Each structure stands twice: as structure tokens, then as C-alpha cells.
């Protein structure tokens, strides 16, 4: 799959989100830098990451509109139906926290949580009264990503 082409096709939809394409790029980069994804799962993982917020800014829109938009884009790229269905299943539930998710789901979920600790996004989330940083850290699946989040949280709090 041509990841660059997927980003191009997704861009008009992602630009409508709160953090825009930059958020998706940050999640993508975090995943590439911090998670070992086996070659046979890379396309599924990275397509899911690129398309995870495609439906809009709200979780409701992401879950309801996202899979339909994602399926259309993936069909344009010639992806097979089982691949499309799996990407749509992942993006249509990526804010949930299932007990035993697939590796592509875990990588997306953890990278999407880690981006919250980035210099670009932390101030936004930290200004919201309902954010419980310790709970967010605990929800991260990977031990390594959890340790990274703990370190980033300490750093961001020192900077604030």
C-alpha cells in the first residue's frame, strides 16, 4: 500500500478535525518510533492510524462516519474487502479499551494516547478539568509506552 497516497486521500477529511492532519502525522510517527510492528501487520496498523480520526472531531462522528469514509478511500487504493473490514473495525472502536485487542489496535490506541503528552497537544488536554492523566497512563497497553507516558507527563508538568 502506498502510505503517502493514503495520507493524500485522507487529508481533506483530516483537516476538518481539531488537531488536523498534524495530529495524525504525530500519531503515525509515534507508532513508527516506539512500536515494533511485524511486517505482515504494518499495512493494517498504519492504515488504521492514518484513518483513525477520518470521520470528524467527535467520537460519535469518528465511529459512525469514519468507517464509511475509510472504506471508500481504501477501495480507491485497491485494498481487499477483508483488509478494509479490519481497518474499519479498528477505527470504529479506537477509543474503546477492550481486554484483548489485536496488535494493530493496541499500537493505534497507545500512540493515540501518547500524542496527548506531546508539546503540541498536552496544553489543550491539560486545560480540561476532566482529564485524569494517571488514568490515561494506566490505560496504555504496552509497558514501554506506559513508561514513556509517565516520563513525558513528568516533563510536561515541569514545563507548565
What are these regions (language model features)?
Residues 42-62, 66, 87-95, 112:
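His-Asp-centered metal-binding catalytic motifs of divalent-metal-dependent phosphohydrolases/nucleases
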Residues 1-5, 11-39, 51, 79, ...:
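Divalent metal-dependent phosphate-bond-processing catalytic cores, especially two-metal-ion Mg2+/Mn2+ enzymes
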Residues 27-28, 62-77:
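An active-site-proximal "capping" alpha-helix that borders the catalytic cofactor pocket
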Residues 80-87:
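Short, surface-exposed acidic
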